[in-house]
Amino acid sequence: MTIFPLPAFNDNYIWIIQDKDSSGIWAVDPGKADVVLNFCHEYQKTLTGILITHHHKDHTGGVAELKQHSNCPVYGPEHLTELVTHPVDDGDRILVFSKVFTVIATPGHTLDHLCYFSEQETPILLSGDTLFKGGCGRIMEGTHEQMLAAMIKISGLPNDTLIYGTHEYTLANYRFALSLEPNNKDLIESNITCQKLRTEEKPTLPTKLSIEKKTNPFLRSHIEALKIQAAQQLNEIPAENPIGAFSQVRRAKDSFS
């Protein structure tokens, strides 16, 4: 199984899953139909499945048109009745080619947000807008408590898990992360690497969970020095509880320029 991105809009990635023994592909969050259809036409592939992480248009906008070209199953949040043929929720399992993906509910960015995890030789997490390289999704519908719970869930996955977020936000995320931890050597090194990748117009994703634990402020909101910096940016006293500390980091990011 291989996974690679098709760029869409300004900074979206439609992740394509393919298997060497199949002419079919799966598309993750196809916000634009023509991107997927053009790929299928050019490489003589057939769309055999769609995974949706949440309802936002840049993740679902191409699904209806793709369904007109393919009778493939569409897995996603159960309330998307016009798009989803196979509604799923936390703990459900989906067979993608020969690999099993387990659904992990991660409300926060949206209330319906789902991630898809496959525990294989190299574990895979399709994280949608919940976790990015160096960042997490803006809290649009959920609560800070819910998003922290999602971060804790993801932190419990194997350290070698490859994380496929759906936006190329890394350099902007790192600018904020470095404002909190300017002396974090892992963060500095990763930022240099990612700047080079973007100069070459290459994606900075996927990332590895072990790297995120060392560099991503939303997986590090328990670190004392980071908490202090986030609170200072908000002109607040550092929170003493985990939810409050995470909230300060998220709100500091929201107002960061």
UniProtKB/Swiss-Prot annotation:
CDD domains: hydroxyacylglutathione_hydrolase_MBL-fold
Residues involved in Zn(2+) 2 binding: D58, H59, D129, H167
Membrane spanning stretches: none
Cofactor mode of binding and number, as noted: Binds 2 Zn(2+) ions per subunit.
GO BP: any one term: methylglyoxal catabolic process to D-lactate via S-lactoyl-glutathione
Record keywords, A-Z: Hydrolase, Metal-binding, Zinc
UniProt entry tagged with the keyword Hydrolase: yes
Domain of life: Bacteria
Binding annotation for Zn(2+) 1: H54, H56, H109, D129
Function: Thiolesterase that catalyzes the hydrolysis of S-D-lactoyl-glutathione to form glutathione and D-lactic acid.
Protein family: Belongs to the metallo-beta-lactamase superfamily. Glyoxalase II family.
Protein name: Hydroxyacylglutathione hydrolase
Organism: Marinomonas sp. (strain MWYL1)
